[in-house]
């Protein structure tokens, strides 16, 4: 959310106060006789306004979005309709985002030591051309910004591969509701206790859809989905009714091809109605649930309350103000500096990540989130979700201080364009930034006696976190980018939210999941996450090498047994020369380190000044290659893949992935199939993490987070002469005044004194704020 520009002479402390008020972070009032902590006006430097002249990595501003709209609506050949008039068979703008210049131009601009013109800004705009014959999705590059005068076609995509959108959802929902209610109203009411139309407080609804693309149906150009029926109570995903319809969409023509009910398939709604009139037809009765606080699917406080009294939980405080700054989507923290932005389709991305002003990563970006379910009935059997097609970035909004992020975090809005609004939409609290004491230590050691001691030295593990949370239907995903003081960059993902269970039957008992209550099976599913890591270690000419740890068979000189041998481990340097050699599938019998470096730069000791990539979230996909939808997500085959960077291979996935084909819009296999040289080239590491989730009763109502976090790390490896965090003012050293005579006492070396703080932590006013503005957290139409 934007703030007014600072007037000349305005006290910076007041600006900090205004920032915190707008963010719902704190209230500078007296509480129980003690004042809340003062904010250091020197440290609090965040500016969350939109720039008039955006930096190169900054998202499109609202001014730029509006100017692109105005320009395109004047292009008569596009025949664009405004939101509200658009239908799936018309031409309308689906969305737009920043289109980055060529990397070489960006690097030249960033590294130039003389004034250099900034590469012109541009937008990539997605237009649904339902008005064409055949219908098509067209992407255009519109430039230069902020006042565009030109556009060029970027690519065309078959219309049946278009991502899900509000215009289509509304049309499909209306069609399904009327068709099914018109033929099966009595059947639905007697079987599931509710209706689709005029339902009062006993409503049924088609809430979820399992895409069935050409690679599944083996029908070229087909766009189909299984739509599941649920009882519409909180939360509807936990109230399936074992009824689904397979719908085929060709242009604006909708056809119901199959109906599934009670382990039976039918060719039409009329066939179901005909069989239902037969007294011998197998009945299924699922009573409509009574909505109450005790309902198992409801996220309301219940059970044995704890703690015994309502005592507030602990929280962190910044006693002397924030130690980071945010301005124009650039964050500065200790020795770190980076830019961040949001892709409406693919989610959060970081750029120009520097440590001690040395470029480490040019781009770190989420590529896709995939969930593959298993089940006995078609909605789960074919539930292969590519979340990019549901627009990962558009679903960032409404993080709650004190729960989703610390109360004192800096909350940042994003502006995007959707097909349902002429004005740019504000995603309130799309990001948060905060510094956090993890409760661990970065390093520590105590030596209690001589000759080394006595001494103690330790540094708390303090990190900066940039967080985004996306909610795709039933699941919530926390995406953290974590910056450690010693030059380590961590990327973490944590899934939570509601599972998608199926109705319990004898056919699916124990095969696809455990029985959770008297009517549900918690279906097995596989979460997978792919990230792009464009690594630039001392420039763009890098090498990828694995340090293979192998067995060393050597002599055993102290053994009395003749010819005895001794086994230990040794390092084998393995330079990966081609892309096919750089495809990594974890093998427990072959431990290794993955390092990236510039061969032209060595440390004083002669070592390669490298960064190590550590994947601690690995998960193996068991699906045969190119089976079903597997080929659309070929990146899931490898836990790490390293390729030569190309401007034509910018993402491993796309928003066109849901309806899988044998030839997807982005085919990741093509990235390495040409097997190019990767020695001394600009390299990209594609990192895949994942976890198999077998739901259990404790996943009701919502999956908890402990044990589900997945992380990968970029860590300096002979890059610095010593620990770069040795200069941390957060360190504490305790030693004897005279190590030979402890009775003379000890001395303590520390430079921060939070124990002197006598004020209380700021009290957030967020909940008062949203009482008046519920759209901050919810979509209010």
Curated annotation (Swiss-Prot):
Main location (coarse class): secreted
Record-given protein name: Putative amine oxidase [copper-containing]
One Gene Ontology term, aspect cellular component: extracellular region
Residues where Mn(2+) binds: 534, 536, 682
Gene3D superfamilies: 3.10.450.40, Copper amine oxidase, catalytic domain (2.70.98.20)
Cofactor: Cu cation; Ca(2+); L-topaquinone; Mn(2+)
Top-rank lineage group of the source organism: Eukaryota
Reported modifications of this chain: Topaquinone (TPQ) is generated by copper-dependent autoxidation of a specific tyrosyl residue.
Subcellular location: Secreted
Tissue specificity statement from the Swiss-Prot or TrEMBL entry: Prismatic layer of shell (at protein level). Expressed primarily in the mantle with highest level in the mantle edge and lower level in the mantle pallium.
């Amino acid at each position: 959310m934007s703030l007014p520009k600072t007037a000349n002479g305005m006290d910076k402390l007041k600006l900090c106060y205004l920032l915190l008020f707008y963010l719902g972070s704190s209230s500078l009032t007296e509480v129980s006789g003690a004042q809340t902590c003062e904010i250091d006006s020197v440290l609090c430097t965040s500016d969350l306004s939109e720039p008039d002249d955006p930096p190169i990595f900054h998202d499109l501003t609202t001014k730029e979005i509006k100017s692109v709209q105005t320009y395109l609506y004047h292009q008569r050949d596009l025949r664009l309709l405004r939101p509200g008039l658009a239908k799936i068979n018309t031409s309308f703008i689906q969305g737009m985002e920043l289109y980055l210049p060529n990397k070489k131009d960006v690097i030249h601009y960033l590294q130039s030591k003389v004034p250099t013109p900034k590469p012109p800004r541009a937008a990539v705009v997605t237009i649904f051309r339902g008005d064409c014959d055949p219908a098509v999705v067209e992407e255009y590059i519109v430039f230069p910004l902020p006042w565009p005068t030109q556009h060029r076609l970027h690519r065309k995509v078959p219309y049946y591969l278009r991502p899900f959108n509000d215009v289509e959802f509304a049309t499909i929902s209306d069609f399904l509701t009327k068709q099914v209610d018109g033929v099966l109203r009595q059947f639905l009411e007697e079987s599931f206790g509710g209706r689709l139309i005029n339902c009062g407080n006993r409503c049924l609804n088609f809430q979820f859809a399992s895409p069935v693309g050409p690679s599944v149906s083996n029908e070229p150009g087909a766009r189909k989905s299984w739509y599941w029926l649920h009882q519409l109570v909180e939360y509807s995903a936990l109230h399936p009714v074992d009824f689904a319809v397979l719908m085929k969409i060709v242009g604006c023509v909708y056809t119901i091809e199959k109906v599934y009910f009670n382990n039976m398939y039918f060719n039409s709604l009329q066939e179901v109605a005909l069989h239902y009139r037969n007294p011998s037809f197998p009945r299924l009765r699922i009573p409509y649930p009574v909505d109450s606080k005790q309902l198992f699917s409801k996220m309301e406080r219940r059970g044995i309350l704890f703690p015994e009294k309502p005592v507030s939980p602990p929280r962190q405080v910044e006693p002397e103000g924030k130690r980071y700054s945010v301005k124009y989507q650039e964050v500065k923290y200790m020795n770190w500096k980076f830019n961040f932005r949001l892709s409406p389709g693919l989610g959060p991305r970081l750029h120009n990540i520097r440590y001690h002003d040395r470029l480490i990563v040019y781009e770190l970006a989420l590529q896709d989130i995939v969930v593959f379910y298993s089940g006995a009935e078609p909605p789960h059997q074919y539930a292969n979700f590519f979340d990019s097609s549901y627009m990962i970035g558009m679903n960032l909004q409404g993080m709650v201080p004190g729960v989703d992020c610390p109360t004192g975090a800096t909350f940042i809005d994003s502006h995007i364009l959707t097909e349902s609004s002429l004005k740019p939409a504000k995603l309130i609290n799309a990001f948060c930034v905060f510094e956090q004491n993890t409760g661990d230590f970065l390093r520590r050691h105590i030596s209690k006696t001589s000759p080394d001691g006595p001494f103690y030295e330790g540094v708390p593990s303090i990190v900066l976190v940039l967080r985004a949370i996306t909610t795709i239907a039933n699941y919530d995903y926390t995406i953290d980018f974590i910056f450690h003081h010693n030059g380590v960059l961590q990327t973490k993902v944590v899934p939570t939210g509601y599972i998608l269970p199926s109705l319990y039957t004898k056919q699916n008992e124990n095969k696809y999941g455990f029985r959770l209550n008297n009517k549900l099976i918690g279906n097995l599913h596989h979460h997978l996450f792919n990230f792009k890591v464009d690594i630039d270690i001392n420039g763009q000419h890098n090498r990828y090498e694995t340090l293979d740890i192998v067995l060393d068979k050597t002599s055993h000189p102290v053994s009395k047994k003749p010819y005895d041998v001794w086994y230990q481990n040794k390092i084998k340097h393995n330079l990966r020369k081609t892309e096919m050699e750089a495809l990594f599938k974890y093998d427990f019998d072959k431990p290794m380190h993955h390092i990236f470096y510039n061969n032209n730069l060595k440390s004083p000791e002669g070592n390669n000044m490298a960064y190590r990539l550590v994947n601690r979230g690995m998960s193996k996909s068991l699906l045969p290659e190119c089976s079903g939808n597997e080929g659309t997500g070929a990146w899931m085959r490898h836990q790490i893949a390293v390729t030569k960077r190309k401007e034509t291979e910018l993402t491993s996935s796309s928003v066109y992935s849901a309806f899988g084909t044998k030839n997807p819009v982005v085919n990741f296999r093509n990235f390495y199939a040409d097997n190019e040289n990767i020695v001394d080239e600009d390299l990209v590491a594609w990192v895949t993490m994942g976890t198999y989730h077998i739901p259990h009763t404790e996943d009701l109502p919502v999956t908890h987070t402990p044990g589900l976090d997945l992380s990968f790390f970029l860590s300096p490896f002979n890059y610095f002469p010593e620990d770069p965090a040795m200069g941390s003012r957060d360190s504490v050293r305790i030693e004897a005044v005279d190590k030979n005579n402890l009775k003379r006492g000890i001395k303590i070396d520390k430079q921060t004194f939070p124990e002197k703080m006598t004020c209380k932590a700021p009290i957030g006013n967020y909940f008062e704020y949203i009482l008046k503005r519920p759209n901050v957290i919810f979509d209010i139409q």
